[in-house]
Every structure is written in structure tokens, then in C-alpha cells.
Curated annotation (Swiss-Prot):
Residues 75-868 are annotated as: 85 X 10 AA tandem repeats of Y-[KN]-[PALKTS]-K-[LPMIKST]-[ST]-[YN]-[PK]-[PAS]-[STA]. Residues 80-267, 279-537, 556-820 are annotated as: Disordered. Its main location: secreted. This is Adhesive plaque matrix protein. Provides adhesiveness to the mussel's foot. Mussels produce one of the strongest water insoluble glues. The mussel's adhesive is a bundle of threads, called a byssus, formed by a fibrous collagenous core coated with adhesive proteins. The gene is FP1. InterPro entries: Adhesive_plaq (IPR002964). Sequence repeats lie at residues 75-84, 85-94, 95-100, 101-110, 111-120, 121-130, 131-140, 141-150, 151-160, 161-170, 171-180, 181-190, 191-200, 201-206, 207-216, 217-226, 227-232, 233-242, 243-252, 253-262, 263-268, 269-274, 275-280, 281-290, 291-300, 301-310, 311-320, 321-330, 331-340, 341-346, 347-356, 357-366, 367-376, 377-382, 383-392, 393-402, 403-412, 413-418, 419-428, 429-438, 439-448, 449-454, 455-464, 465-474, 475-484, 485-494, 495-504, 505-514, 515-524, 525-534, 535-544, 545-554, 555-564, 565-574, 575-584, 585-590, 591-600, 601-610, 611-620, 621-630, 631-640, 641-650, 651-660, 661-670, 671-680, 681-686, 687-696, 697-706, 707-716, 717-726, 727-732, 733-742, 743-748, 749-758, 759-768, 769-778, 779-788, 789-798, 799-808, 809-818, 819-828, 829-838, 839-848, 849-858, 859-868. One of its GO terms (cellular component) is extracellular region. The keyword Ligase does not apply. Produced by the byssal gland. Residues 140-158, 764-776, 808-819 have a biased composition (Pro residues). The modification 4-hydroxyproline is found at residues 89, 93, 115, 145, 149, 155, 159, 175, 179, 185, 189, 195, 199, 211, 221, 225, 237, 241, 247, 251, 257, 261, 285, 289, 295, 299, 305, 309, 315, 319, 325, 329, 335, 339, 351, 361, 365, 371, 375, 387, 391, 397, 401, 407, 411, 423, 433, 437, 443, 447, 459, 469, 479, 483, 519, 523, 543, 549, 559, 563, 569, 573, 579, 583, 595, 605, 609, 615, 619, 625, 629, 635, 645, 649, 659, 665, 669, 675, 679, 701, 705, 711, 715, 721, 725, 737, 753, 757, 763, 767, 773, 777, 813, 817, 833, 837, 867. The modification 3',4'-dihydroxyphenylalanine is found at residues 91, 95, 117, 121, 147, 151, 157, 161, 177, 181, 187, 191, 197, 201, 213, 217, 223, 227, 239, 243, 249, 253, 259, 263, 287, 291, 297, 301, 307, 311, 317, 321, 327, 331, 337, 341, 353, 357, 363, 367, 373, 377, 389, 393, 399, 403, 409, 413, 425, 429, 435, 439, 445, 449, 461, 465, 471, 475, 481, 485, 521, 525, 541, 545, 551, 555, 561, 565, 571, 575, 581, 585, 597, 601, 607, 611, 617, 621, 627, 631, 637, 641, 647, 651, 657, 661, 667, 671, 677, 681, 703, 707, 713, 717, 723, 727, 739, 743, 755, 759, 765, 769, 775, 779, 815, 819, 835, 839, 865, 869.
Length: 875
């Protein structure tokens, strides 16, 4: 070809590092056309200068080292690398690689090798044939059930189930209420609410001329032009006939609170005389723009304080009122059901379980779980010991280091302010605190007043109602447990919980001096605190509740296992493990070559000068191994002791449960769940299922005749579960269900229903969650993990795990009794002694050492690797 003369190698055309003999075979004319596949100047420096000048648009690749890389296929270039490069030799196909550090031992066919793994490898355990693994997912995992393109599943419901309509994503559902409910209308954002008043009230226009009123009317003040109307995003509700309306004021209005009849008011800013109303309407005097008018009211009037423009009023309702909750714009409503319906929550339901159930809470993605333990387990605290308390103990939550605690006081305690000193008053005095500018004032009311909430509407319920706390949208619900449950806190590290106080505690708040004062209240008034939007409330629990400690985000919890669980220890990086052997094993040191001897010969190995010899012992000797200085040993325990393993920092423990536990996995927010099916359903897995049709077909499971398929929806669809006939519905986002008149409401943020003891809850998930089907006990699921996922398994009580080791661990294999290997070792090897056939190693360890499990000789370890993992010789 026209480039052949240019490409022909010439000795004088190469730079100094070139070794001409390497190129000698090319001088024979072979059927090689270099220009067909290789640009002649690629990667070279001076070899093909004439052609490089022709290829004007070609820019030769500059490298950090002078690599000649572009030779014909038969040429194996010798690369020059930077000083830090550690070359890995390449061998012909028949080459049997010799390890660079530790020899590769050949074993008889019955030897079951224990592989070594890279540091990032998370082993997948092997289980008995009847084991049903519970799957966990990494935070980024988004499993989605795969259906054939034409699959239109139909959900199956119990006979009494009333189907829920599915709505577009922008649909805002309106719950149904009992007959006594007086609806609070919702308005568009631009709606200017006109409050409804009792029958005797004569409304007054806001800006139009004031009409004349009956003699009993006390005028509503007029405001200067700078008045900012009370925002109308929250509609003003309608009130019962006995309600006395509260006027709204401009933002700069300084409220003068109303006091009980015995209170002698001290004026706060400017004393305002009260006016006696004449039978005819008296015009309101006009004041300068900065005047803060205080209206006068009839004696029975209950004053309504002024609020900042951002204040969201909470209406008060009669005792039988069933509140209609307000929802964020993204709320996907769940319809309300008849009282006998037991709904399955779809967002953050956390059911209660029978007293024997140890719940596995769901946590934020960064949370490292702290396991729950069986009742007989005596926990060794891993972060901060949380003592157990008598049933009447009110738990004091644990906080991150940066938390500034607000102490709780006994009922008679008079708080000492933390900002400005406040004088002490007689016991009947109710102080009027000062607040920072951003504070949303809360009015004081007579004892019979029904408060209007200041953050999100919280209806009032009869005295028997048990309130459900409300949470911000980003809150991950904490389950409620039976009294015997020892809970774990799942707060993020930045969480500042709010303490709860005894009912009689009167907190005295201190605020910045610029605060617009908050009125004082009659003794029987229980003020409701208002919180900024970012406030994360702390739930108060019944007296028998055992609080869950909260840990920083970096905390790695240590799981506990059922009493029969045999722990899998973890070792420090420098630990040289000593494997456990079958009773008849003839151990072999793995340092210096040991010749083969007659079968009765017990070899005494030879060691390097630095070796601390470990002798061989008679059969009855219980050896005490020695460990490197950094080794953290674990003491030996009686045979009945169930060890609790410790794990390296990167270990994400999987909690294991008693055999009867039906686990419900917790998922990250982005998890797409698989639908659940009736117990008789034989599901076909939905992630890596082998198709039965052409490759584009996603296997469609076969169902029993009674199965009503659950549809697959577009990505934006928020699935609604099917429920048993007696299920009580739980709202999906911020829905407030309707209750019987005896029901005590919980706050409106995230409802947490309680269920009968036999109820197996289906966890609720974020809106993007696609449900995963639950299968009957005999179902053998196929893994649905991405290739990079390394699951952590739980084990049945009788499972003996196979050990995994840190990267630097040098495992020593175990052999059948008749095997006498002969090995040569590098000079730095640490020898392991050999023992007589009946040797039972009784190891005494330092306190933190985690015992290594020995397995029966019939145990066959099966190690599975992720698809991309190529195990390398790490010796």
C-alpha cells in the first residue's frame, strides 16, 4: 500500500529506548496491512514523521511517559510507566500463575476453599433450602415490577371493599365527614374570605362606608391606608352560634390581651379608655396613620389578638366537629371509608404489633440501624447506654452534641428566663412574655374558649380521643409499639426535639426585646405552642413507652440476633486469623516448606528468626493463641453463650428476628415497591426474571383463578393498596380521617393508626414508591437487585455463618485428615502451628475479640460474587 514504505521499521528511525530485536519478526513479509487498522503515527514519537506531516489534522496523543504503543498486532510493546506504576505481568494462556506473595496451595478434591475478598466485597450468605431471605435495598435502588406491555392488572379486593378512585396527580381530595360536620370551605388563592358570624351579628364592610348598627353593636375599627389585610389563603371558618368573632388587625398592631374578670390590667403601650356604646351608632374617630386602635367590645366579647401576615389561623369547632385537614399542594388524597374499613396506609403508616413483635422501624437513608433484640438479650450499649425504666418513667430523649436542652420542670417550678431577667411574681400572676419579631402571637382565651390553631388546623375532639401527632412533610414516621417494646430513636443528627412537660407545667418563655407581647391567660388555659415551619416536633408517648435513643448519622449500629444465632466476628485489619478445623484435621503450617512424612509423623516446623513459635500440643492441650498487638480479642464464653458480633465501620447490619417474624422491609424514599398479592399467589420475580417469550417480553406471572391482578401504573402514579374488610383507613399524606364522636384526634401531619394484635402491617412509602408484592411462605423469590448491589441477609436460628475477613486477612484453609501438603513460603510469613488430630482449640481472647465460628465438616460454603467482581489472588 502507499503507506507501506513509511511504516517499514528502520533501526535508525527509533528513539533510544527502542529495542530492535523486538521488531525482528516484522522484517519478514507477512500478510499485514498496517494502514487498514492502525494510523501509523498514533502514539509514536518519531517513527513515521513523513506521514505525520501529511495528516495535518492529526494531533498525536501526548502521554505522561514516552510509550510506543502503536505497533502491528503481533508486537507486544514494552511500555514505560511512571515511577509509581506496579506492572502486572501478562502470561500466555497456558501459564499457571504463581502468586506474588503467598503460594497457591493445591488441595485434594474434597477441600472447600474459602476465598479472600476485596475490601469492598459484601459477601452473600448461603442458607438452608427453606430459608426465606428478607431483602434490603441500597438508597439509590429503584425496583419496579416489570409487566408485559399489554398487561392491564386488576386489583383484587375483599368482597366488602369499596374501590378507591384514582385521580390525576393534581387532584386534591375532599374527605367525607359525619352528618354533624360543618364544612370549612376551601377557596382559590385570590379569594378574600368573608367570615361568617353568629345570627345576631351584623357584618361590616372592610373598606366601604360603615352602616348604622343596632345599639348592641360594638364597631369594628377602621384602619389606616397602610393596613395589610389578614391573609386570605386560609379561609375563615364558620362558627357555632355562641362564637364571638375576633377582629383582624394590621401587622403593626400591638394586641392588648383580654384577662379573667379578677385581673387588674397593666397597660402595655398606651392606655385606651373604653367607650360606652350609645343606642345609636357612634362614628369612630380618625387617628394619625401610626395610631394603633383598640376596639371596645360588649362585656361578653372574646378578643381576637392580631397576628403577623403569615399567621395561619386555627378555627375552633364544637365538640362534635370532625376537622377537614389542609393539605400541601402535592397531596394525593385517599378517600375516607366506612367505619368498619381497615385501610392500608400508603405513605407512612406504622402499625402496632402484638406484644411479641419486635418492629423494624424505617429510617432516613443515612440512618445506620440499631437492631432490636429478643426479650432475653442483655444489650451491650454501642453508643450511649439507655437504661430501662419503670413503666411510669417519662423518657428523656437523647440529643446530638450540639443540642441546647430546654429543661423540664416540676409543676410548681417558676422558670428563670434565659435572655432577660424577669422579676418573680405572686403565684397568681401569669407573666406576659416578650417574643422575637418572628413570633406568631397566640391569644389568651377564657376557660371555655375553643382555640384556633396557629400552624395547621387541628380540630378539637371529645375527651376520649387519642391524638395523633402531626409531622412536617419530610418526617419519617416513628412506629408506635406495644408497651414491652424497647424502641430505638430514628432522628437525624440535626434534630432538636422539643421536650414535653407535665400537664401542670407553666413554661415561662423568654424572647428578644423587640417582640410584640403575648397576652396572659386565665389559670385554666393550656396554651398551644406555635412552631416555625422547620420545627420537628417530638412525640410524647404513654408512660410505658421505652424511648429510642437517637444517634448521629455516622453511627453504625450493632444488630442482635435470636438466642440460637451464632455470630460472625469481624477482625481488625492486622489480624491473622486461625481457621477452625474438623476434629480429624491435621493442620499444616503455611510458612516454610515442610517435607512429607509418614502418616504418624507430627512435623515441627522451622520458623524465621522473628517468629514467636507456637508449639504443638498433646491431644488434651487447649492452646492459647497469640495475636498481633493491635488485635482486639473476645473472651470465650460458656457453651450456652450467644455471642454478639462486632462489625467493621462500613458494616451495615441486618436485623434478624425470631422465626415467627414476618418482616416488612423499610425502603429509602426513592424505592419503587412491588405489588402485594393474596397468600395463594405464586409470583414470578419482577427484576431479573428470565423471559419466557422473546427478549423484549417481561414475564407475566400466572395467578390462581381468584386473583384480581394489581395494575402497573405510569411512573407518576401513586399506588393505593387493597385492604381487608375491617381495616381502618389511614391518610396518605396529611389526610385527617373521620372519626366517631368518641374518637380522639391525632395531629394532622402523619397519622399513625393502631391495628388489632394480629394485624400484619404493610409499610407505607414515599409518593414515588412502587409497591413490591408480598408472597406466600413457599415462594422462592428471585433476586431483583442491580448488579452493584450487595445485600445483607438475615439468618434462621440454626444458621452458622461463613466468615468474611478484612482485606489484609490471610486465611489458612482446612484440609481432610489424610492431606499432607508441602509448601514453600516467603520470608515474612507468620507461621500457624499444626495440631494433633483431636486438638480442640480453646482460645482465650482479649475482651473485645469476636469469636470465630467453626463449621461442621459437611458445611459447604457457597460464595456468590457480584457480576463485575473478579476475585484476584490477594496473597
Amino acid at each position: 500500500t502507499k503507506h507501506e514504505p513509511v511504516y517499514k521499521p528502520v533501526k535508525t528511525s527509533y528513539s533510544a529506548p527502542y529495542k530492535p530485536p523486538t521488531y525482528q519478526p516484522l522484517k519478514k513479509k507477512v500478510d499485514y496491512r498496517p494502514t487498514k487498522s492502525y494510523p501509523p503515527t498514533y502514539g509514536s514519537k518519531t517513527n513515521y514523521l513523513p506521514l505525520a506531516k501529511k495528516l495535518s489534522s492529526y494531533k498525536p496523543i501526548k502521554t505522561t511517559y514516552n510509550a510506543k504503543t502503536n505497533y502491528p498486532p503481533v508486537y507486544k510493546p514494552k511500555m514505560t510507566y511512571p515511577p509509581t506504576y506496579k506492572p502486572k505481568p501478562s502470561y500466555p494462556p497456558t501459564y499457571k500463575s504463581k502468586p506474588t506473595y503467598k503460594p497457591k496451595i493445591t488441595y485434594p478434591p474434597t477441600y472447600k476453599a474459602k476465598p479472600s475478598y476485596p475490601s469492598s466485597y459484601k459477601p452473600k450468605k448461603t442458607y438452608p433450602p427453606t430459608y426465606k431471605p428478607k431483602l434490603t435495598y441500597p438508597p439509590t435502588y429503584k425496583p419496579k415490577p416489570s409487566y408485559p406491555p399489554t398487561y392491564k392488572p386488576k386489583p383484587s379486593y375483599p368482597p366488602s371493599y369499596k374501590t378507591k378512585k384514582t385521580y390525576p396527580s393534581s387532584y386534591k381530595a375532599k374527605p367525607s365527614y359525619p352528618p354533624t360536620y360543618k364544612a370549612k370551605p376551601s377557596y382559590p388563592p385570590t379569594y378574600k374570605a368573608k367570615p361568617s358570624y353568629p345570627p345576631t351579628y351584623k357584618a361590616k364592610p372592610t373598606y366601604k362606608a360603615k352602616p348604622t348598627y343596632p345599639s348592641t353593636y360594638k364597631a369594628k375599627p377602621s384602619y389606616p391606608p397602610t393596613y395589610k389585610a389578614k391573609p386570605t389563603y386560609k379561609a375563615k371558618p364558620s362558627y357555632p352560634p355562641t362564637y364571638k368573632a375576633k377582629p383582624s388587625y394590621p401587622p403593626t398592631y400591638k394586641a392588648k390581651p383580654s384577662y379573667p374578670p379578677t385581673y387588674k390590667a397593666k397597660p402595655t403601650y398606651k392606655a385606651k379608655p373604653t367607650y360606652k356604646a350609645k343606642p345609636t351608632y357612634k362614628a369612630k374617630p380618625s387617628y394619625p396613620p401610626t395610631y394603633k386602635a383598640k376596639p371596645s367590645y360588649p362585656p361578653t366579647y372574646k378578643a381576637k389578638p392580631s397576628y403577623p401576615p403569615t399567621y395561619k389561623a386555627k378555627p375552633s369547632y364544637p365538640p362534635t366537629y370532625k376537622a377537614k385537614p389542609s393539605y400541601p399542594p402535592t397531596y394525593k388524597a385517599k378517600p375516607s371509608y366506612p367505619p368498619t374499613y381497615k385501610a392500608k396506609p400508603t405513605y407512612k403508616a406504622k402499625p402496632t404489633y402484638p406484644s411479641t413483635y419486635k418492629a423494624k422501624p424505617s429510617y432516613p437513608p443515612t440512618y445506620k440501624a440499631k437492631p432490636s433484640y429478643p426479650p432475653t438479650y442483655k444489650a451491650k450499649p454501642t453508643y450511649k447506654a439507655k437504661p430501662s425504666y419503670p413503666p411510669t418513667y417519662k423518657a428523656k430523649p437523647s440529643y446530638p452534641p450540639t443540642y441546647k436542652a430546654k429543661p423540664s420542670y416540676p409543676p410548681t417550678y417558676k422558670a428563670k428566663p434565659t435572655y432577660k431577667a424577669k422579676p418573680t411574681y405572686p403565684s397568681t400572676y401569669k407573666a406576659k412574655p416578650s417574643y422575637p419579631p418572628s413570633y406568631k402571637a397566640k391569644p389568651s382565651y377564657p376557660p371555655t374558649y375553643k382555640a384556633k390553631p396557629t400552624y395547621k388546623a387541628k380540630p378539637t375532639y371529645p375527651s376520649t380521643y387519642k391524638a395523633k401527632p402531626s409531622y412536617p412533610a419530610s418526617y419519617k414516621a416513628k412506629p408506635s409499639y406495644p408497651p414491652t417494646y424497647k424502641s430505638k430513636s430514628s432522628y437525624p443528627s440535626s434534630y432538636k426535639p422539643k421536650k414535653t412537660y407535665p400537664p401542670t407545667y407553666k413554661p415561662k418563655l423568654t424572647y428578644k426585646p423587640t417582640y410584640k407581647p403575648k397576652p396572659s391567660y386565665p389559670p385554666s388555659y393550656k396554651p398551644k405552642t406555635t412552631y416555625p415551619p422547620t420545627y420537628k416536633p417530638k412525640i410524647s408517648y404513654p408512660p410505658t413507652y421505652k424511648a429510642k435513643p437517637s444517634y448521629p448519622a455516622t453511627y453504625k449500629a450493632k444488630p442482635s440476633y435470636p438466642p440460637t444465632y451464632k455470630a460472625k466476628p469481624s477482625y481488625p485489619p492486622t489480624y491473622k486469623a486461625k481457621p477452625s478445623y474438623p476434629p480429624t484435621y491435621k493442620a499444616k503450617p503455611s510458612y516454610k516448606a515442610k517435607p512429607t512424612y509418614p502418616s504418624t509423623y507430627k512435623a515441627k516446623p522451622s520458623y524465621p528468626p522473628t517468629y514467636k513459635a507456637k508449639p504443638s500440643y498433646p491431644p488434651t492441650y487447649k492452646a492459647k493463641p497469640s495475636y498481633p498487638p493491635t488485635y482486639k480479642a473476645k473472651p470465650t464464653y460458656p457453651s450456652t453463650y450467644k455471642a454478639k458480633p462486632s462489625y467493621p465501620p462500613t458494616y451495615k447490619p441486618k436485623i434478624s428476628y425470631p422465626p415467627t417474624y414476618k418482616a416488612k422491609p423499610s425502603y429509602p424514599p426513592t424505592y419503587k415497591a412491588k405489588p402485594s398479592y393474596p397468600p395463594t399467589y405464586k409470583a414470578k420475580p419482577t427484576y431479573k426474571a428470565k423471559p419466557t417469550n422473546p427478549s423484549t417480553y417481561k414475564a407475566k406471572p400466572s395467578y390462581p383463578p381468584t386473583y384480581k391482578a394489581k395494575p402497573s401504573y405510569p411512573p407518576t402514579y401513586k399506588a393505593k393498596p387493597s385492604y381487608p374488610p375491617t381495616y381502618k383507613a389511614k391518610p396518605t399524606y396529611k389526610a385527617k380521617p373521620t372519626y366517631p364522636s368518641t374518637y380522639k384526634a391525632k395531629p394532622t401531619y402523619k397519622a399513625k393508626p393502631t391495628y388489632p394484635p394480629t394485624y400484619k402491617a404493610k409499610p407505607s412509602y414515599p409518593p414515588t414508591y412502587k409497591p413490591k408484592p408480598s408472597y406466600p411462605p413457599t415462594y422462592k423469590s428471585k433476586s431483583i437487585y442491580p448488579s452493584s448491589y450487595k445485600p445483607k441477609k438475615t439468618y434462621p436460628p440454626t444458621y452458622k455463618p461463613k466468615l468474611t475477613y478484612p482485606p489484609t486477612y490471610k486465611p489458612k484453609p482446612s484440609y481432610p485428615p489424610s492431606y499432607k501438603p508441602k509448601i514453600t513460603y516467603p520470608s515474612t510469613y507468620k507461621l500457624k502451628p499444626s495440631y494433633p488430630p483431636t486438638y480442640k482449640s480453646k482460645t482465650s481472647y482479649p475482651p473485645t475479640y469476636n469469636k470465630k465460628i467453626s463449621y461442621p465438616s459437611s458445611y459447604k460454603a457457597k460464595t456468590s460474587y457480584p457480576p463485575a467482581y473478579k476475585p484476584t489472588n490477594r496473597y
